[in-house]
Amino acid sequence: VSGLAEFRSRVEAFLGARYPRRHETLRHGQGDDSLVGAAFRDSDDEAGDLRRARAYQRELFDAGLAWLSGPVEYGGAGLGAAERQAFAEVVRRYDVPDVNGLLVGQQIVAPAVLAHGSADQRARLLPALWSGELVGCQLFSEPDAGSDLASLRTRARQVDGGWRVDGQKVWSSGAHLAHVGELLARTSPDPASRSRGLTMFLLDMESPGVTVRPLRQMTGTAHFCEVFLDDVFVPDDAVLGEVGGGWAVANVSLSSERDNFGDESANLFIRLLDRLLLLGQEVGAAEDPDFRDRLADGYVRHVVNQVLPASLETATPEVATAGTSLVKLFATDADRRLVQLALDVLGPALVADTGAWGTYAWSRVLLGVHATRIAGGTDEIQRNILAERALGLPREPRPVREDRRR
């Protein structure tokens, strides 16, 4: 416990010397009233957010506070879940740059590199991703392969010195700003199993033949992208894991994405909670019993989700893997409940801009928060994982799909 207290003090000292505490900057009617991070902001804001995030991440990395659970030889701190939780609690008290634009590289790409990368890939990429030097993106989903990822159609054919890749990816967060992409492609057909014959590659996003097109979302922003791959050359040393073993690599990334979803959602939740409290005080809802009860209910759900990851550390591998789905379900549910409360308080002012500070700003959150039911694996997929892997229930019948390649 004393060691953990010392760690908290160290984090407090580091952040306190560089950034203001959030309670010192949070005032209703003052400053920018935007509520969301890089995923929902305009493109100019997103690029600026990323610049600030990379500078902040470099500071953390140099101080040994960037990758708390990572191996020391790759720039990590070699610490455990308790320190990670303590850091998260402390950092939420400070007005630090939004690191949303770095999370795919750190929480999806980096775990796969650590688990399956060569010695060179680990030494070269892990410190770069965690210091903010490199920004990563995920190139898994396709127009006809989302939840059913094993049906992907992007192909990689072997040539002298590497591979030539052709295909299309979609819903790739931040691909227009990324340096490296974790790319899943089919390298050989396997009639017995669609998940075999897939290979993972580490794609240089500046490679000739890579075209990235941001997709306009209903929030009005364009954070997600579609990526076209036209005869893109990928060298042999960019294969991540074994040729034909891409499914195992993908599962590492997907499990880590679910596991870390709670951290990302927690940061959003605290921002929304603070602003909702201010809003309630401003419009006179703070004394309403229903408002207070729903606010407390959402916060309790949030706290439960914060302790779930630590409890999973002692679970069996099967339950621990499935438990990451529970983390994601709890996180998205807490966020949606809070946004619904804001909608009930504000009514039409949430969707019609009256010019009042801190009201219409919720509209973009309302539009964006429902995407969390899909991002990182749909709620339905998460429930299937829990049912089949943790509870041992029968597998859901898989529909027979027509082979569209004929």
Residue ranges of predicted features:
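A structural signal for short hydrophobic beta-strand segments in well-ordered beta-sheet cores
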Residues: T154-R157
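N-terminal glycine-rich flavin-associated loop
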Residues: G101-D120, G146
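Glycine-rich phosphate/cofactor-binding loops in nucleotide/flavin-utilizing enzymes
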Residues: A82, A86-F87, I108, V249-V252, ...
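C-terminal helix-coil-helix/basic helical segment that borders enzyme active sites and/or dimer interfaces
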Residues: R27, A285, P289-R292, V303-A356
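Amphipathic, small/basic residue-rich leader segments at the start of a protein or domain
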Residues: V1-L103, R124, A128, T354, ...
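A short, Trp-centered hydrophobic/proline-enriched beta-strand micro-motif
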Residues: G132-F140, L183-L184
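Glycine-rich beta->alpha junctions and the first turn(s) of the following alpha-helix
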Residues: V210-Q306, T372
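A short core secondary-structure module
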Residues: D166-V212
